[in-house]
């Protein structure tokens, strides 16, 4: 019987030095910093991305009223409002309305700056159910631009929209009775330069 072969001595696992741990911590810190910094630029980019792709129930944009007459079918449109990181009060004048499909409708939201400083915000938005976003079409909306508010200022802002008649032709929408339009206002860190001409909202009008 042959004697057992000698086993090679086991080498201890290489120890990670302090430099490796420091590098990992630095990378994690950089990622967090980038995420925080990007959050201030995320609202306009997110809106652009969603308008381009239709992601997350984002509505469509139109520059003219629909050519066909409104349909007999109606849906309930609910209006939601939220504020994130701004000293603002933000709410719709009406919580919900009945809308004939294809009819152009104007509703208003009101914002109030509750602070003693001038502030600027911009709204991100979406529609639920998410599949309805491609049929919910806006002609005019305060969410298209930044909204500066002086200390204590209030403003009524219109949303002009219609639901595309193609909504009724899509069988997936047969059970849809309620559509929710939701906005969330975020602060703008570096607002765009204010133009020389005034860009205040047009005087209020009733439903188109």
Swiss-Prot record:
Alphabetized GO MF terms: copper ion binding
Pfam families per UniProt: CtaG_Cox11
Residue spans crossing the bilayer: 20-42
Highest taxon, organism lineage: Bacteria
Record carries keyword Lipid biosynthesis: no
Periplasmic side of membrane: 43-208
Keywords assigned: Cell inner membrane, Cell membrane, Copper, Membrane, Signal-anchor, Transmembrane, Transmembrane helix
One GO CC annotation: plasma membrane
Subcellular location field: Cell inner membrane
Main localization of the protein described in the UniProt heading: membrane
Membrane topology: Single-pass type II membrane protein
InterPro entries found in the cross-reference section: CtaG/Cox11_dom_sf (IPR023471), Cyt_c_oxidase_assmbl_CtaG (IPR007533)
Segments in the Cytoplasmic topological domain: 1-19
One GO BP: respiratory chain complex IV assembly
Function: Exerts its effect at some terminal stage of cytochrome c oxidase synthesis, probably by being involved in the insertion of the copper B into subunit I.
Family label: Belongs to the COX11/CtaG family.
NCBIfam families to which the protein is assigned, alphabetical: PRK05089.1
Protein name: Cytochrome c oxidase assembly protein CtaG
Species annotation: Rhodopseudomonas palustris (strain TIE-1)
Recorded name of the encoding gene: ctaG
């Amino acid at each position: 019987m042959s004697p057992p072969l000698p086993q090679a001595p086991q080498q201890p696992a290489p120890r990670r030095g302090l430099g490796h741990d420091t590098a990992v911590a630095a990378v994690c810190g950089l990622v967090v910093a980038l995420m925080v910094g990007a959050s201030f630029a995320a609202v306009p980019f997110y809106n652009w991305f969603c308008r381009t792709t239709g992601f997350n129930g984002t509505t469509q944009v139109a520059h003219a009223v629909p050519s066909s007459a409104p349909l007999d079918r109606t849906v309930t449109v609910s209006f939601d409002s939220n504020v994130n990181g701004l000293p603002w009060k933000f709410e719709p004048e009406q919580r919900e309305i009945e809308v004939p499909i294809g009819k152009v409708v104007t509703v208003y939201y009101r914002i109030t700056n509750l602070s003693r400083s001038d502030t600027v915000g911009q709204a991100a938005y979406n529609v639920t159910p998410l599949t309805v976003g491609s049929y919910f079409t806006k002609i005019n909306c305060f969410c298209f631009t930044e909204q500066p508010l002086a200390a204590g200022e209030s403003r009524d802002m219109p949303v002009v929209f219609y639901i595309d008649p193609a909504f009724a032709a899509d069988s997936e929408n047969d059970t849809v009775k309620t559509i929710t339009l939701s906005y969330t206002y975020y602060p703008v860190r570096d607002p765009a330069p204010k133009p020389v001409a005034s860009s205040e909202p047009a005087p209020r009008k009733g439903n188109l």
